């Protein structure tokens, strides 16, 4: 279990959200975070608690491509920004995750300092997701390609599709939910 201390420095500004756990890849020693070359990175079987007084906190930021997966990860985000930011696609996946609380359960959009990236790799599939008690939107999505939810249980303010500039981006498939 990963626990963020109450009122932790650097996690107090929701205009500049910041993840507790963040995976990335490097192009060069000075050029980091290119999700389309983040391969075979796994985040499996753990819990994250975002503490009190951390309105800018995100539990997990894990966006990658082939072989990248997030499985059996659960975030307590009451009073925080979001449980998850970014998601895998292109041969990766997300399964058996949950978020309780937060402004957003899943915030699938770009944030600074990497605002040019979409909120996902192409065509993300998220299965067996449970989102409860969010205050703004359960899911905010600006994905590359369609977002597919399978077996989603959402008890909160719904899904917002933010759209992207290309016609093939931003669609939503909801299956057995």
Each language-model region and where it sits:
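Extracellular/periplasmic carbohydrate-active domains that bind, remodel
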Residues: 1-177
């Amino acid at each position: 279990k990963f626990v963020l201390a109450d009122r932790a420095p650097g996690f107090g500004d929701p205009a500049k959200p910041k993840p507790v756990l963040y995976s990335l890849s490097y192009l060069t020693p000075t050029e980091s975070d290119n999700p389309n070359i983040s391969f075979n990175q796994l985040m499996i079987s753990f819990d994250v608690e975002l503490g009190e007084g951390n309105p800018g906190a995100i539990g997990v930021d894990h966006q990658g491509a082939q072989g990248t997966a997030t499985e059996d990860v659960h975030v307590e985000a009451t009073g925080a920004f979001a449980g998850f930011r970014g998601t895998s696609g292109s041969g990766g996946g997300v399964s058996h995750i949950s978020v309780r609380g937060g402004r957003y359960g899943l915030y699938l959009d770009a944030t600074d300092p990497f605002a040019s990236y979409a909120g996902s790799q192409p065509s993300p599939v998220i299965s067996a997701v449970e989102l409860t008690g969010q205050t703004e939107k359960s899911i905010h999505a600006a994905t590359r390609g369609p977002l597919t939810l399978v077996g989603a249980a959402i008890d909160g303010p719904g899904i917002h599709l933010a759209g992207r500039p290309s016609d093939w981006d931003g669609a939503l498939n909801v299956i057995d939910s």
